[in-house]
Amino acid sequence: MNAKTKLVTDRIRLRCMEDRDQATLFGLLFNDPDVMTYYSGLKDKRQTREWVNWNQRNEKGYGVSLWIAEDKRTGEFLGQCGIVPQQIENQTVMEIGYMFARRHWGNGYAQEAARACLDYGFNERQFGKMAALIDPGNKASIRVAEKIGMHYSKTIRKWNKPIAVYERKSYN
């Protein structure tokens, strides 16, 4: 594994975001209305650059961020998945986040990558609890959270809308 690679699964390599990823993130995720349905809207190129910078700061400060998900064999961009600090009711909680390009939906990539992040968070980083913050209408994302063993905890108000919090406590 090179220094930029964070995790590897059977099919996916998760690596740190780089400035060069901005165009791909914009073109395949942030400018696709279907992918962004449950977000507050599409992101423009400036917002995409800020997103990459935010993830780079998280990586430097916390050692975790949303990582670029690539096909391990071909290097093709699949999406993003990783762990980011989020505020939930005045507490910092480590969130597993995932978003994949539409053409890769239905292939189990989100579940595979999210499970790897969960394992990393609990086994390598010793996080006591991890969460997924999900728009209640996003049934596909809820299924991913449930398949990796997360359970509905509560609904909070975040990002100017109701957000369902799914949680899982450490394996230990």
From Swiss-Prot:
<protein>
    <recommendedName>
        <fullName>Uncharacterized protein YkkB</fullName>
    </recommendedName>
</protein>
<dbReference type="InterPro" id="IPR000182">
    <property type="entry name" value="GNAT_dom"/>
</dbReference>
<dbReference type="Pfam" id="PF13302">
    <property type="entry name" value="Acetyltransf_3"/>
</dbReference>
<feature type="domain" description="N-acetyltransferase">
    <location>
        <begin position="12"/>
        <end position="172"/>
    </location>
</feature>
<dbReference type="InterPro" id="IPR016181">
    <property type="entry name" value="Acyl_CoA_acyltransferase"/>
</dbReference>
<dbReference type="GO" id="GO:0016747">
    <property type="term" value="F:acyltransferase activity, transferring groups other than amino-acyl groups"/>
</dbReference>
<dbReference type="InterPro" id="IPR051531">
    <property type="entry name" value="N-acetyltransferase"/>
</dbReference>
